[in-house]
């Protein structure tokens, strides 16, 4: 603290004296250092604000500006500015104290005042965020009242709050108790002598300290502080305001008794002690006080008491000053003081109505008001009722009452005129002033009387009691005021005022209906309601009588009105005739309710025969019949008057009216009027009902419109927020996917490079091996050819010998007979001898040279081989022949190699096709583990062998053809042998299978015989089984067991044993299930028979081979699918058909899981070596089914495997068919992913994921059809799940034919001319995905499909179709065209390759074989095409008929 104060002193060198003065001045006031420090800091901040420039036009002052100017200069601001701001927030009272001191400094001159207001205004602008609202109001009010009441030592009380008075008075009290000597001097001596106590002058001039003393009613402190200086008496009225405000009894009594005396002449209280010098001199001379500042008017003091209902001060005035009652005037109002400076006239006018002070909102107690008014009534002081200050003479002339005078104290009685024929009211007061007046004064009175008659019409409206009733003042205050006005409980039997002259009739009715019972009893039972003779046609009693029969009054209120009319029966007769009362009774209640503020009566003269009451005109003529008899018949024959007391009162009035000889009325006229009134009432009620209905409708329509607008606005806002969130999420997902794709592409490129390198190495190794093999084959061929040539040479030599002999014999004959032909032949062809000679002349090494010169690889030559020109073969010819043969053999081997390569390629295509088909069977999820087919490309080469046949003169072409035929025969023979071997093996296998089946049947029979012959054998009815553990097939919930057994000693069955105690509804359910089995559903387990004993029920079921769970866990699911010759989707249909069968009979399985899906292996077929395998549904949950409805029988949680039941089952809600749909979705996922679960493979967390709806379908991303279907099936909201029929109609389960039809329908939608308006939308939708704006195809589809072969034009087609490869629409056209014209395309491709003499693409020809193969090809290239088209065309299915069937 000291260091902080030192910093303040250093920073405030310019005003160091002020700081020290403030510290000295607050030693006793603030004994705590913390308060001392806070006040000093606040004063320093205010002084700093005085340095800021102030401009009235511009507000440049703020905390930021304050920091800029002083933050760098002041040390304490640099360190502790945050702490000072917290001080401003927390120390509210200290802030008020310092600011108040700042306002009350002794400044002379207006300039300094304006400067102070500007400094405070700167302080408010700088620190307004850290000040409370009370302090801000405090400052604003101080600035606004500064000019007007700055010089007043005691300010009006309205500027300060009560809490500040208490706290400042407590601080003042603490300061006095710190020093006993000071306290004694103040209380005992009343004189200040010590100069050290200079701080008390602060409280002398401070109004807050004086207010605290008056509030605590401390008379000694009050007098000692007030009498120090004579200047304190300048505002004596303000002091009395404070005394009356707090009702300080001790201060008022001491002040009045000791220091004031009554001046009877001037009716004032004069101060009699410690007067000023001038006052003492005047008082000694005249013995009267002429100083107005030292006196107060009694009427003014009385008004102070009435403002705040100061009952204690009023008692003192009445009791201590006996002449006070006779000296005060009669015109005392409850409207309070008309302040000259601070109060608003409107607030002054209504202060008594709101019962609160002007600024403090301090509620005055109701009892205090009542006691104060009763005090005046007991002391015979009554309040005037006027607000417009009408002269007393007007009241005297109008009401004939006495008015108390200000100047006269005597009491004389005068007689006054009567205001009623029967009652006389007198007053016991005189007015001597009126007796002493001259004639001139009487003339003035007459003139005033005439002028004031005009104002009297508005007098009732402005009267005090009428305003109190209008603003719903407390009833106790009103009753006390009424009793004062009529001088009740004053010891006077006569009335002074009449209530009907003070309140209007309608206001009286309102007050009687609104006020409580005490007010009504006072008004009615005390005969406060009366009417003067001047208005004999008043409507008050008529209205009372009308409301007696209405529904507005309660049962408690009616007796008061009955009592009133019993006391005053003459009022009814003197006002209106009795028949008119009954007529108006029928209609007045509704009219009064609707037109409460309208005039109830309009009249002109007193004696008029026609008077208008509530819309009725009474123009009745005298008749001979007595109207009283007519009224009596009306009472007896009508149900108008249901109240018996009312009937009695009416009869009393009738009897009373007989004596008065009232007018007569006909009975028929009265009945007609009664009927008319009833009709009018009904019509009015109907009109009111219609109006109300119209109003209600309008209000409802407006409310509905508003609600719709609000809902739309909320929806728009939510949609915008959701869109923004989705866009953000999409951007993030795109970035992540883009990164993933980049990483995947990099990895793929690396893997591709590695694979290419491996393939290159393998190809190099294969080429080397192939070259080695070729070389070996060529070497073998050379050796064989050499051997054959040797053999041929030998044969030639032998043949030459024979030829020589023959030639010798023939030479002679030929020469002789054919000389000329021989010559010609010799020219063309050498003779055989010459050939032989040439052949002999050639060396034998020529053959070897020619053989060695043969190239290892011979190119193919033409089929035309040069024939020998002579029938005689020479060695050269034989060599040529051999060479030709070798060439032919090499050509054939090359052709064989090419054929083998084509066969290998064809086989590879078939293998790929099988893989594609298998992938399609598996739903497109990778290659299953059971597909592993390998082909060896290396084929064994066939060797060339030639038989040693005799030489002939046949051409070489014939030899080659024979050689080819022989090879083909050999190949055919070898193929036949292979086929025979295969058939023999198949027959052997079939025989083995039959033997195995027989053996299996024998084994089963042996096993069953073993079961029967065991010691634990059980026979119940037709069932026979053994209870050993080896014969238990499974265990279930509630003590259920399944055994192997026999039914009727022949048929093997599974016997299910269930306990009756745990399953009370078995019989009902079993009958229903047996009835289902009679309907022959192949996908359901058959219930064969039922037996019972005392404890158990036994069911005979179909004996199956295993369950889906066993297949997956053992890894045999792939073998099961292969052997069934079905796809996995087709096998899943078996389960769906079974559930469809159950749901069609209103049965819910409620416990579907892989353990309850059983496998049934059928018989194998000889042709395909495949079996008719299938899935069947078992365990229909006997404790959970109900046949009568589509709901399951109980709401208990099933006891099957966890993770296959939806959210509503876990919450124990009633279960519907959607439960089975959820389980089917999980089972489909289980099948397609080979054992995975959509909610996690960990069984512990599956239920948690189901509740939170956290599913993981990423393993199915490659198959979007399955992904979308399963996602809808396993959704948390059961209303979103599809039915079993919708599941079967999903594209996932479509066959190829339906898919082709769907593509045709899609193409028709695109081609329709009527759809041209949204064709552009269709193209955009087809090119992009639903979830985001990403394109469906990342690349143009001509890069994904072999388009060049499929675009071959057919024969005779002149127009070629053009396609846009970046649009899905043209892809659909392309697929449809290829499916429709696949045969023509295939022929065109074959012809094109025949013309070009090249080999066609066998893959293209393979998938062009049928429409199904074409669709499979396209699905393998673009897997999710059908799913994409299905999703994009969904919105058009409702409007287009040919699309509707695909979606429903």
UniProtKB/Swiss-Prot annotation:
A Gene Ontology cellular-component term: IRE1-TRAF2-ASK1 complex
Catalytic-site annotation from UniProt: 1151 (proton acceptor)
Biased composition (Low complexity): 428-437, 978-1008
Entry coiled-coil feature ranges: 666-817, 887-921, 974-1016
Disordered, as annotated region: 412-446, 975-1008
UniProt protein name: Probable serine/threonine-protein kinase irlB
Pfam family, one: Ribonuc_2-5A
KEN domain: residues covered: 1296-1448
BP GO annotations: IRE1-mediated unfolded protein response; mRNA processing
Gene transcribed to yield this protein: irlB-1
Sequence similarity: Belongs to the protein kinase superfamily. Ser/Thr protein kinase family.
Residues at which ATP binds: 1033-1041, 1056
GO MF terms held by the record: ATP binding; protein serine kinase activity; protein serine/threonine kinase activity; RNA endonuclease activity; unfolded protein binding
Superkingdom as given in the UniProt entry: Eukaryota
Lineage summary: Eukaryota, Amoebozoa, Evosea, Eumycetozoa, Dictyostelia
Biased composition (Acidic residues): 412-423
Catalyzed reactions: L-seryl-[protein] + ATP = O-phospho-L-seryl-[protein] + ADP + H(+); L-threonyl-[protein] + ATP = O-phospho-L-threonyl-[protein] + ADP + H(+)
Enzyme Commission number, as recorded: 2.7.11.1
Transcription regulation in keyword set: no
SUPFAM superfamilies the UniProt entry points to: Protein kinase-like (PK-like)
């Amino acid at each position: 603290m000291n260091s902080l104060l030192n910093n303040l002193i250093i920073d405030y060198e310019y005003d160091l004296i002020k700081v020290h003065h403030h510290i000295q001045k607050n030693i006793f006031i603030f004994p705590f250092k913390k308060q001392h420090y806070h006040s000093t800091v606040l004063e320093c901040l205010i002084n700093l604000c005085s340095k800021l420039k102030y401009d009235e036009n511009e507000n440049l002052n703020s905390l930021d500006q304050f920091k800029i100017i002083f933050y760098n200069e002041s040390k304490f601001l640099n360190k502790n500015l945050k702490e000072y701001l917290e001080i401003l927030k927390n120390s509210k009272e200290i802030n008020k104290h310092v600011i108040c001191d700042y306002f009350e400094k002794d400044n002379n001159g207006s300039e300094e005042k304006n400067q102070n207001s500007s400094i405070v205004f700167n302080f408010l602008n700088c620190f307004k965020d850290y000040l409370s609202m009370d302090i801000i109001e405090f400052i604003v009010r101080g600035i606004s009242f500064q000019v007007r009441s700055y010089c007043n030592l005691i300010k009006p009380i309205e500027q300060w709050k009560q809490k500040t008075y208490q706290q400042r008075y407590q601080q003042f009290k603490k300061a006095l108790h710190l020093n006993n000597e000071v306290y004694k001097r103040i209380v005992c001596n009343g004189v200040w002598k010590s100069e050290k106590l200079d701080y008390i002058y602060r409280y002398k001039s401070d109004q807050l300290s004086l207010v605290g003393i008056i509030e605590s009613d401390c008379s000694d402190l009050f007098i000692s502080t007030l009498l120090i200086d004579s200047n304190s008496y300048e505002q004596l009225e303000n002091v009395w305001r404070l005394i009356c405000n707090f009702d300080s009894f001790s201060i008022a009594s001491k002040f009045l008794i000791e220091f004031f005396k009554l001046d009877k002449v001037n009716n004032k209280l004069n101060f009699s002690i410690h007067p000023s010098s001038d006052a003492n001199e005047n008082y000694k001379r005249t013995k009267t006080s002429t100083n107005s500042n030292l006196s107060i008017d009694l009427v003014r003091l009385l008004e102070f008491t009435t403002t705040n209902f100061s009952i204690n001060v009023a008692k003192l005035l009445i009791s201590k000053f006996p002449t006070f009652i006779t000296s005060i005037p009669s015109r005392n109002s409850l409207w309070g003081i008309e302040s000259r400076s601070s109060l608003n006239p409107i607030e002054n006018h209504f202060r008594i109505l709101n019962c609160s002070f002007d600024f403090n909102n301090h509620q005055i107690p109701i009892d205090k008001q009542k006691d104060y008014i009763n005090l005046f009534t007991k002391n015979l002081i009554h309040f005037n009722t006027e607000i417009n200050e009408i002269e007393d003479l007007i009241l005297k002339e109008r009401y004939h009452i006495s008015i108390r005078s200000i100047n006269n104290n005597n009491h004389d009685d005068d007689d006054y005129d009567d205001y009623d024929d029967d009652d006389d009211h007198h007053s016991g007061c005189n007015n001597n002033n009126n007796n002493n007046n001259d004639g001139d004064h009487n003339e003035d009175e007459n003139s005033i009387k005439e002028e004031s008659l005009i104002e009297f019409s508005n007098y009732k409206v402005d009267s005090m009691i009428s305003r109190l009733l209008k603003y719903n003042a407390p009833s106790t205050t009103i009753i006390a005021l009424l009793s004062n006005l009529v001088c009740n409980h004053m010891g006077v039997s006569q009335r002074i005022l009449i209530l009907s002259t003070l309140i209007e009739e309608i206001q009286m009715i309102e007050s009687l209906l609104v006020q409580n019972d005490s007010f009504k009893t006072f008004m009615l039972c005390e005969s406060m309601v009366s009417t003067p003779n001047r208005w004999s046609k008043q409507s008050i009693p008529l209205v009372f009588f009308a409301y007696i029969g209405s529904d507005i009054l309660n049962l408690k209120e009616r007796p008061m009105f009955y009592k009133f009319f019993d006391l005053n029966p003459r009022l009814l007769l003197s006002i209106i005739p009795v028949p008119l009362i009954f007529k108006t009774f029928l209609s007045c209640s509704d009219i009064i309710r609707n037109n409460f503020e309208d005039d109830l009566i309009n009249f002109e003269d007193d004696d008029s025969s026609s008077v208008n009451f509530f819309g009725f005109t009474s123009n009745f003529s005298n008749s001979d019949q007595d109207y009283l008899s007519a009224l009596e018949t009306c009472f007896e024959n009508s149900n108008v008057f249901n109240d018996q007391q009312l009937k009695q009162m009416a009869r009393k009035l009738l009897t009373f009216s007989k004596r008065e000889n009232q007018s007569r009325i006909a009975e028929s006229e009265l009945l007609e009027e009664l009927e008319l009134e009833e009709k009018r009432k009904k019509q009015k009620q109907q009109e009111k009902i219609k109006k109300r209905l119209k109003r209600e409708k309008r209000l409802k329509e407006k409310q509905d419109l508003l609600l719709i607008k609000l809902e739309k606005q909320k929806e728009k806002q939510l949609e915008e927020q959701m869109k923004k969130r989705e866009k953000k999420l999409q951007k993030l997902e795109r970035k992540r996917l883009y990164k993933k794709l980049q990483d995947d592409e990099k990895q793929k490129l690396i893997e591709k490079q590695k694979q290419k390198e491996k393939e290159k190495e393998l190809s190099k190794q294969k080429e080397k091996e192939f070259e080695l093999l070729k070389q070996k084959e060529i070497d073998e061929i050379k050796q064989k050819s050499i051997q054959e040539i040797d053999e041929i040479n030998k044969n030639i030599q032998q043949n030459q010998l024979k030829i020589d002999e023959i030639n010798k014999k023939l030479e002679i004959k030929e020469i002789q007979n054919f000389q000329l032909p021989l010559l010609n032949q010799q020219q063309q062809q050498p003779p055989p001898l010459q050939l032989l000679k040439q052949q002999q002349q050639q060396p034998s090494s020529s053959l070897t040279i020619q053989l060695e010169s043969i190239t290892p690889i011979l190119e193919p030559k033409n089929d035309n081989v040069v024939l020998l020109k002579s029938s005689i073969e020479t060695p050269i010819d034989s060599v040529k022949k051999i060479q030709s043969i070798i060439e032919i053999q090499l050509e054939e081997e090359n052709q064989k190699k090419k054929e083998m390569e084509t066969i290998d390629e064809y086989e590879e295509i078939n293998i790929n096709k099988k893989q594609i088909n298998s992938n399609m069977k598996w739903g497109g999820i990778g290659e299953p583990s059971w597909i592993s087919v390998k082909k060896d490309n290396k084929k064994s080469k066939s060797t060339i062998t030639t038989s040693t046949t005799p030489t002939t003169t046949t051409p070489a072409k014939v030899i080659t053809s024979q050689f080819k035929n022989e090879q083909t025969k050999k190949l055919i023979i070898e193929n036949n042998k292979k086929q025979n071997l295969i058939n023999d093996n198949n027959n052997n296998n079939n025989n083995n299978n039959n033997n195995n089946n027989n053996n299996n049947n024998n084994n089963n029979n042996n096993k069953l015989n073993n079961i029967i012959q065991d010691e634990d054998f059980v026979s119940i009815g037709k069932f026979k089984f053994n209870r050993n553990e080896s014969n238990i097939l499974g265990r279930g919930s509630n003590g259920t067991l399944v055994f192997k057994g026999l039914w009727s000693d022949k048929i093997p069955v599974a016997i299910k044993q269930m306990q009756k105690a745990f399953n009370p509804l078995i019989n009902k359910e079993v009958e229903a299930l047996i009835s289902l089995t009679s309907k022959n559903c192949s996908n359901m387990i058959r219930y064969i028979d039922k037996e019972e004993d005392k404890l158990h029920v036994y069911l005979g079921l179909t004996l199956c081979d295993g369950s889906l769970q066993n297949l997956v866990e053992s890894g045999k699911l792939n073998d099961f699918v292969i052997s069934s010759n079905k796809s996995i989707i087709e096998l899943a249909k078996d389960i769906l058909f079974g559930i469809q069968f159950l749901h069609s009979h209103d049965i819910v399985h409620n416990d579907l899981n892989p353990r309850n899906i059983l496998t049934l292996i059928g018989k194998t077929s000889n042709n395909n070596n495949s079996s008719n395998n299938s899935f069947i549904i078992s365990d229909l949950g006997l404790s959970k089914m109900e046949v009568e409805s589509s709901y399951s029988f109980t709401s208990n949680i099933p006891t099957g495997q966890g993770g296959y039941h939806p959210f509503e089952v876990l919450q124990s809600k009633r279960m519907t068919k959607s439960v089975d749909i959820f389980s089917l979705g999980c089972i489909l996922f289980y099948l397609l992913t080979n054992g995975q679960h959509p909610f996690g493979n960990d069984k512990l967390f599956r239920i948690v994921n189901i509740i939170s709806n956290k599913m993981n379908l990423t393993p199915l991303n490659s198959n979007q059809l399955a992904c979308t279907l399963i996602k809808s099936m396993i959704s948390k909201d059961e209303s979103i799940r599809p039915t079993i029929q919708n599941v079967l109609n999903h594209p996932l389960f479509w066959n190829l034919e339906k898919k082709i039809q769907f593509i045709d329908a899609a193409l028709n939608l695109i081609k329709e001319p009527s759809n041209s308006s949204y064709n552009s939308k269709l193209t955009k939708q087809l090119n992009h995905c639903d979830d985001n704006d990403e394109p469906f195809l990342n690349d143009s589809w001509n890069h994904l499909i072999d388009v060049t072969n499929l675009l071959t034009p057919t024969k005779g087609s002149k127009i070629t179709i053009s396609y846009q490869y970046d649009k899905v629409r043209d892809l659909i056209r392309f697929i449809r065209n290829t499916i429709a014209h696949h045969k023509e395309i295939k022929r065109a491709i074959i012809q094109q390759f025949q013309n070009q003499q090249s080999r066609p693409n066998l893959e293209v020809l393979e998938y062009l074989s049928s429409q199904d193969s074409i669709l499979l090809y396209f699905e393998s290239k673009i897997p999710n095409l059908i799913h994409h088209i299905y999703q994009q065309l969904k919105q058009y299915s409702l409007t287009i008929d040919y699309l509707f069937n695909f979606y429903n």
